[in-house]
Amino acid sequence: MRRYGIWLTAATVSLLGTQVLGFAMAWVAAGRGGAFAGLVLTAINLPRVLLLLAGGAVADRVGARRVMIIADVAMTVLMLGLAGAALTWGEQPWLLLGAALAVGVVDAFYLPSSGSLPRLLVRGPALARALSARQLAGQFVAFTGPPLGAVVVASAGIAAAALGNAATFALMAVVLLGLRLPVPALGERPPAGGFWRQAFDGVRTAAADRVLRPALVLTAAAAAFLLPVSGLLVPLLARQRQWPAEAGGAVAGALAMGTAVVAVTVLVRGAARRPGAAAITGLMIAGGAVAALAVAPGVPVALGAGLVAGLGTGLFSAHIAPLVLGSAPGTHLARIQAVLVLVQSVPLLVTNNVLGGLADAGSASVVLMICAGALGVATTVTAVRSDLPAARAADAPLPAAAG
């Protein structure tokens, strides 16, 4: 776990720099109107989604560490260029759009590689603990990044945020250069073949696997109907119920707290022996709590429902992520991670808009009940019609480390 701890520390610092820059870009873009702010977000997300499968194939072909080093160096250069351009020409719209497109392209190659790296650094039984530590680090960054970004952009502008981000990417590249990773065995190296065939082979492999297929379907359901609850539906519910903004924030905070409690528990005590069953149970609990949130008569009940929803969310995410990563064939680690990011990103893009529109046209409570019902159907079908409940954590030994 020592090597993993070194990498996770550097990755957390790098992610903090990215969060600071992300807030700075969003703030500057919002100053030019909501339509332009949405265009900047699209410029990041569209190339990321379109190129994810290619990014996974490249990582499986040439190695996740090598891809990450190249991406970190590229982002260091890009951030330095953004800082210099912002100081020279100001915070121009074309500059924001160009930077957003470049970030989206690099992300498409970086995310599958970084997602597969824990499997190369940590043995099977400790994988759930390792991913829980990463989840906690991500929540810490999500909590501290935007306020820090606000301070930076208000006091020094987007150029300072870009310079700080460049420094964190450079740090990440240095850490990766000194990190020893295991050399895959011959049987774990991807076979030769056409590039695009290899890229889409991750989808075929996931669809054919009796554990990966239901795990990814359940992940897509969670992305579509659980992730929008905190960021979209809770604020809408609070406004429609005429609760103060602090109440809506407290409910969202209770959900985050519940998720963190489970992550800490798994980090300290380890994961369940049957992660598939634990993940299904967690999503069932979260769905029930979302239903309770929909009919909550006041803020205290909503707070309790939010906390339980967070506990269920944490139980699901703390077990589904290591199960997917541990079940992936050694030849397809990054490609399966690319598919995992896709099944989280695409449904969320669709349902955020659909659910928001439904809540505007009717009631946030009704939309929350729809989400709860969809989660209930997804978990029940998965529990009854798939092999996921019986799935156990993978326990594959690590190969020897390379110098």
Q: Which residue ranges define each predicted feature?
A:
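Alpha-helical transmembrane-bundle signature of multi-pass membrane transport and export proteins
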Residues: 1-403
